[in-house]
Every structure is written in structure tokens, then in C-alpha cells.
């Protein structure tokens, strides 16, 4: 990369980071690369699924950086992974044929869903360790964490990660013997083979795998047909003894798998246990920003933030909300999804789903003020003494965490401040919490008073 190309690309990244939320930047921009700038055309390498986002949101960034560095209008030519020939062990491997090879494999054997990958999994603080462990397992199956046990509530991405592990291994080794199956289906297969007196076939099928991916293992903990846990125990031992990778997911920790034999619980804890929790606001915004690329509608930022505030339990609710909105927008022949349209579309889902308590921002300001010994008037004003600034930033942080208000709306409630001020306060307090345990306890105490 020439000096001018480096300056240009650094400026593109700088402008993008200043305009986007951190989680959005990390997902859509961080992994992109500038290959060259030739004849006023910037060739940029990125994931193909992110092209539409760049076209919609970063054109002005490219133009600005282009005029600053080259004093010219720079256009963009996007290059995708499947277009690049990657030399590996002196063999050129093209990603597109690899993907075709994956799709052409007998899916009845692995039952993997090819749409799930690490590349399209949105990372946040709530799932970072689970993702890192999953990637490590996919890179060196059977040697790193065996078994890998991922637990968390429904709709948080456990099934996505299971399939991503399998697909990643299969891309590197198309001959790998992989099986994705729910614990419920494992039980069903066991019952069928018992009835047909073909247990040898079941043993052959599962005990000679290279990678076993079991979803919702808690189903095995139910009181099932005698011998099911015994068979799974023997399958587990056969695979583990041969250094074959096992990955399990559950809605609870191994120790809370009631009615499961102790010897199985013990084995589930041999490797690594990681937790996935509900996505925070910033991750939900990134998830929505990614998902709306699948729809032919315009979603203004305030609409995205509104939706992110409405559903805080899992990703499936967010996906369902977008489907509801698509239905209403198509019926009304609307191109731009305003907050009002979104609210109308998701009304039934909100009534049927878990209710979010509506917390006035003024209540947050009041409780924060009482805790830190300042008035609401001081929180809204411009005075910058240390205790008032801390109270103000904590109140902004909680307003974003505990309400569905957009950043501009929150800023308005704090003396008409700009949305960037709110975002700065939110990021600052979030960073401080990760380093200051006493502040984290203070904020939890305030949250409990508000609730």
C-alpha cells in the first residue's frame, strides 16, 4: 500500500468510526481492507453481505476522504472473499467453490444449516467468550476445549454457533464426519433403533464421528426411555477417548441439569463451559442494522434504536419484529419505516410478549440525583463539577440501558444535549464499570431503586 493509500484508508476508517456506533463499526467496517486506489477507483475487500451497508451509509465517507487526500472524486469497486484466490499449501483455493462443495454435501449426513457462519454472527460483550471458544474449537477440533458446553436462554445464538462450528470444520475438511442433532432427536433415533432392533447401526452412526454437535442437551435430562442416557454416555466416551470434538448447548449450566446422571454432568464439565446472555442495546442495534439489509425498506437510525429498545430478551424477537414491519409496510406500500410505523407493526407482538416497564427518564434522573446528592435541575444544567458530571453521565447511561428512547430523545431530556454527548456518556460509564467494581455496584443499586 502506498503512502497516499494508507492515509486515505486511515481517513475512511476514522470518519466511519466517528459516524457509527462501535458495535456497528466493528461488524461492518473493522474487517474491510483497502487493496488499492488506481485511476480514482478504490478497490475495497469486504464480506459480500456488507456491501449494501457500505453503499447506503459510507459513500459520503469515501467521497470526503477522496477529496481530502487525492483532491478527486473516488468511486469504489468492492471485491469479495469468493473473488480472491487464496494460496494455501501451494494450492489456490477459491471460496466460492468451497461454498458450493459445502452445499453439495449430503446434508442428511450432517444436518448443518449452511446459512450460519462465524462471519454473520454479531458479536457483543454478552457472547464474546462463547464466540472465541467456538472459533478455537473449529480451528483445532478435539484438542482445545472438549467438550465445549454453551449455555444461555432461547434465541441468543447457541444454535447459530453450533452450526458455524460445523460449517467451518466442513469447509476445511469436506470429508469430516459431522453430525448436528437436537437431544430430542437423538432420543427419537434411539427409540426407533430399539424398536427395530438395529442398535448397532446407531452406534456406528454416532461413535465414528469427527464432530458431534448436540443442541438443547437439557432434553436428555428429562425422564426418558430407559437406556437413553446410558447410550449417550457410551457415545460420549467413545468420541472423547478418540479425541473427537463434542459441543453441547443447553438453557442451563451442567450443574442445573436435573435428572441427568452425575457421570454425564461430570463429563460435560471436563472441557470449557461458557455463557451467552441477552444482547445489550448497542449489540441489538448492530443486529438490526445487519438484519435490515435483507429488506427493501429504509430504516432511519431513530427507528432502529426504537426497535432495539423494545426487545431486550433475545434475537428472535428482533427478527420477528422485522417480519411484522415488512408485512405492514408491504400492505401500506411504504418505503421508509418511521418510528410510528414500527410501533404500529409490533403492537401485537409487544402485547403477546414479555412486557417492558415504561420508565420515565425523569424518574431515572431523580433516583440518580438522590444517590449522588444533586438535583435534577443540576443534572440537566451545564455545571461541570465532578459529582454533577458523574451523576449526569450515569443518568444518561441508565436512560439508554433502561428505556427505549433514541439518543436524540435522551439528549433532549438532559437540557437539549446532542445525541453524541449521550453516546459519549454511555460509552464512558460502560468502560468505567468494566474497571471499577464499586461504580458497578453503585449503578446496580440505583437500578434496583428505579425498578
Swiss-Prot record:
Binding site for ATP: 155, 157-159
Example of a GO biological process term: DNA replication initiation
Region (Domain I, interacts with DnaA modulators): 1-77
GO molecular function list: ATP binding; ATP hydrolysis activity; DNA replication origin binding; lipid binding
Record-linked Gene3D superfamilies: 1.10.1750.10, 1.10.8.60, P-loop containing nucleotide triphosphate hydrolases
Span list, region Domain IV, binds dsDNA: 330-451
InterPro entries, per the entry: AAA+_ATPase, Chromosome_initiator_DnaA, Chromosome_initiator_DnaA-like, Chromosome_initiator_DnaA_CS, DnaA_C, DnaA_dom, P-loop_NTPase, Trp_repressor/repl_initiator
Record keywords: ATP-binding, Cytoplasm, DNA replication, DNA-binding, Lipid-binding, Nucleotide-binding
Positions of region (Domain II): 77-110
Region listing for Domain III, AAA+ region, in residue ranges: 111-329
SUPFAM superfamilies named among the record's database cross-references: P-loop containing nucleoside triphosphate hydrolases (SSF52540), TrpR-like (SSF48295)
Subcellular location, record wording: Cytoplasm
Keyword DNA-binding carried by entry: yes
PROSITE patterns in alphabetical order: DNAA (PS01008)
Short name of any one Pfam family annotated for the protein: Bac_DnaA_C
Gene Ontology cellular-component terms listed: cytoplasm; plasma membrane
Top-level taxon in the UniProt lineage: Bacteria
Domain statement: Domain I is involved in oligomerization and binding regulators, domain II is flexibile and of varying length in different bacteria, domain III forms the AAA+ region, while domain IV binds dsDNA.
NCBIfam families linked: DnaA
Oligomer and partners: Oligomerizes as a right-handed, spiral filament on DNA at oriC.
Known function: Plays an essential role in the initiation and regulation of chromosomal replication. ATP-DnaA binds to the origin of replication (oriC) to initiate formation of the DNA replication initiation complex once per cell cycle. Binds the DnaA box (a 9 base pair repeat at the origin) and separates the double-stranded (ds)DNA. Forms a right-handed helical filament on oriC DNA; dsDNA binds to the exterior of the filament while single-stranded (ss)DNA is stabiized in the filament's interior.
HAMAP family, sorted: DnaA_bact
Family to which the UniProt record says this protein belongs: Belongs to the DnaA family.
Name the record gives this protein: Chromosomal replication initiator protein DnaA
